[in-house]
Amino acid sequence: MAIWQGRSLKKPSGGRIVLARKKRKRELGREPANTRVAEEREKRKIIRTYGGNRKVRLVEALYANVFEGGKGRKVKILNVVENPANRQYARRNIITKGAIIETEIGKAVVTSRPGQDGVVNAVLLKEENA
């Protein structure tokens, strides 16, 4: 069944709202990309969006652009340590904005939206030695 992002057909009281028009194609939504950590190679999907534009969805990510002090490096993603969007996402290795990922050079926080941008950008976390 399609995901519809139009107005709800229920009133706050629970009563029904009768639409004065049909549902429009522009009101359709899509399933989330749920970008995972790749095993061997990255996988992208190009989708058509409203107005004929294109959006690149990152389905499987192998590398991340990690920035530290203005310098960026392309490093391999090892796994997802924590994900504040959903605690099950860390277990399933799903990357979203705000997720903490383990890379070759240390832990980093994802600053991009991989399902919308098609790339994983992250900022390196400072390791605290206590």
Swiss-Prot record:
A biological-process GO annotation: translation
GO cellular component: ribonucleoprotein complex; ribosome
PROSITE patterns associated with the record: RIBOSOMAL_S8E
One Gene Ontology molecular-function label: structural constituent of ribosome
Top-rank taxon: Archaea
Xref: InterPro entries: Ribosomal_eS8, Ribosomal_eS8_CS, Ribosomal_protein_eS8_arc, Ribosomal_Se8/biogenesis_NSA2
Keywords in alphabetical order: Ribonucleoprotein, Ribosomal protein
Gene3D superfamilies in UniProt: 2.40.10.310
HAMAP family, A to Z: Ribosomal_eS8
Membership in a protein family: Belongs to the eukaryotic ribosomal protein eS8 family.
Protein name: Small ribosomal subunit protein eS8
Species this chain originates from: Thermococcus gammatolerans (strain DSM 15229 / JCM 11827 / EJ3)
The gene coding this protein: rps8e
